[in-house]
């Protein structure tokens, strides 16, 4: 072998240069610098010193013999005649030590340099063996280690040419067949001298663990050596001194070629294979601690008594030996089965030591069975507690929030009150608030209302015809009831609500979807009943009015008549000092159209309209329908944010993903900014007109809120059965505010209408008053019922009746309709309803007077007055007053009323009694006045 420097030697063995120089100095070598050369003799000297320093003998025996004895148990027979037979197997093997080559010496030196501490630990573990054995036994231990190492190599992914684990029938054959390859193959010399040995199997397992650890260390050294050789090979190609570096690489001697045929050099392993080997070694170590013998499954089970950890059980099962297909592991009769693991006979559940307190969420109404489930108790227990509280219910009945709270607290749990709109609140918390969003100016939303015969449709068609750009697809046909118009004053969004059904529903839900209302009135026809309804709707919504006096091109047009009639409805023109703009227009000639749009733009500019854009879209549903081939089609108006295709939309009880959006011209669009009406596809069911829509984060949340709204709507429908009735009009009214009785009045002639309105307005006083939210001449229509439902009013008909649609709607919504034919009867019933809304008057009535004749002392009540009833009767549990010299000095309650030591409830006039006054001392001569408080209904 060529001479190398100290630095190259340190690099080849994977150790530091300082450590190599220190060990050379201890060995007596004269190397001082990393550039000093090291010959083969100096290497052998260093290797011998390292071996002697770690207690290794220089000379080892050439031939050793190993004896092994294995005892197993075999069960024969079946049923009651089963017998147990002990089988003892004895084995004897002879091994010949191989000669140590130069390459093996270098590897051994590398092992000595890298891991002396680990070898010291191994020496310590082996030193625990008793020393009362001979040197021949130590030789047997070394050979046992060699056998175990051979078995480990046989189990590796790259086995050696011969496998010694194959059993043979005769011991002599085993020795003869294994002696020859042992002589031909060089084996690494043992590092640690074994001083003693055990023949017991447990000691063999310990020795196997030590040899296994040694094998892992050798594999690590081989890997490092291979990495070093790869690094040197890469450096050869780049460095300029290729010849010098090539000479520094150690090559095997020529005499080793023959031996290398039989002994292959270990192949460098990847990081994954090293990780698998480390994991397998850890499993084997843990299994070695728990298992005393690996002869059979029964002995594995005896060593694993009551393993509690599941991971330990899995490790033992994986590490326990499995029988091979060829029957190589036949130490027991059932060697092919899994090892029997004994586990501690305990279940994982532990009985709670204390009472568990739950936080029970209680909504506004909850079923008894569901409440019991939330407290983790039986429903019968909840029914018992409710019975103690005086409530008799079944497990399927619902109880209110207060009762459920009392039951939960009485049963020792914590009640958490949940609002009925908790789901809605959580949804709104996930959406960015409008106050925190960026606001931008938006176009005003204009609603055109009026009588159908007054030219409303013609006015809308003229505006669209003149404002829609030429060449637009669908510019003639209006696909939806809303569209946008570009004017010189900006964009305007027009909304058409025929029949006012959508507008009424919007106002009922508090959705302010419109900014300005254009009231169309025909100049030749004047104010009609539907015109009055439009005024009432606009006032209820709180939006400004712009009156368009249409048909001024006709000869019979009279704009002043329209102003006079609307002034009677409190719609005062600006010319007369009011705040309502009147514009004369003609839908046929186009006269006044520009002034009308300018007036609307001016009114919108005063409102300073704005909307957020960087928030989830929200708005209101204009109308919806089922279209054949397209499914649910909904017309919506975006009020805030930007609606995009693909958003998850929630509208009332409907939800779905926006699959397509169509504008008023029939074009498909991808997004819609605020104040833009669009048609959308993708909802599961048609939403109600006036429902507010909102874009939610995910479909699961939309489904949850939709189901909650459906359940809430069913509950509210049941609660509305008592609404809008004269007998219940005073319910929910505040005591300090003026109470209003809303009425929708319909009569047969206008004279009767004016007379009844004047008479009912005079009935009220400072506490109660009649308010006419709607009225007119003619029969009761569906619009009247809708108006009454949204305002909580009572419908009164004088010599008129409701049509079929209005009657069906009133029956379904439990709205009350009253018919009268005599005006005095109508006024008397309304007066009675107003009187019922008045607060009752409290009147005191003196029921008896008792005079104190003497005062006694009672240990239970304190002072007791001996009295004589001089007027009326004295009653127990009624309020009293104590009068001294005809002056009231105390007001309280009677604590006791007795006659001859007996408790009585009443003492008549002229009889004596004992009266105990609570928290007051009376004197002789005082008068005790007993009174009663009664509530008397007031009248107008």
From Swiss-Prot:
Listed Low complexity bias regions: 181-193, 326-337
PROSITE patterns listed in its UniProt record: G_TR_2, IF2
Biased composition (Acidic residues): 159-180
InterPro entries referenced in this protein's UniProt entry, alphabetically: DNA-bd_dom_put_sf, EF-G-like_DII, IF2_assoc_dom_bac, IF2_II, IF2_N, P-loop_NTPase, Small_GTP-bd, T_Tr_GTP-bd_dom
GO MF entries: GTP binding; GTPase activity; translation initiation factor activity
Bias type Basic residues, positions: 282-294
G4: region residues: 550-553
Region (Disordered): 116-137, 151-196, 210-294, 318-346
Residue span of region G1: 450-457
Record protein name field: Translation initiation factor IF-2
Species, as recorded: Teredinibacter turnerae (strain ATCC 39867 / T7901)
Gene that encodes it: infB
